[in-house]
Amino acid sequence: MEFSDIFDKSAEVRNYADCFKDGKIENIKVFEAQKRIEITLRPVKTVKKSVIMAVAKDIRSVYGLGAIKIFTHYEPELFSAAYYPEILTYITLKFHGSAEFLEGSEAQYSDGTLTITLAKKGKDMLISNGIGEDIKKLVSEEFDLELEVEIIDGETDDDYFSNIDDYNSY
């Protein structure tokens, strides 16, 4: 039985049926007294966190639930730097103050290390708030993959202007 078969009354589940097609339901926990459901899905391709949130919100509303949590569990080989926008969504929702430091950042994944290059400074703040560790935990839980996270500060306006001064001195 597929995810879309169980929650067939949800318009969002039908809208995003392709995202969940051929995936498996690993686990369903029902807490009747709290009207809460927890589902662990194993999709065959990564699914945007915004899709998961929209589907969960609709299921909660349509089925009159108090809460629903949808967890995703992917094959390790599906992880790449292309998943970074989903990591950003998770981190900025969990740590509201991190959004300004992560805005414009980019990621590369190679040899077991996810390297995040910030557009500005902010590495120290992100590290002191445990962002790197949270990313490791998220990837471990979703992909069964252990990785290292490296955060690199980007240029600031001061760096830019000092480079112009160096250029103008020639």
Set out the residue ranges of the language-model regions.
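Intrinsically disordered, low-complexity basic tails and flexible linkers associated
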Residues: 1-170
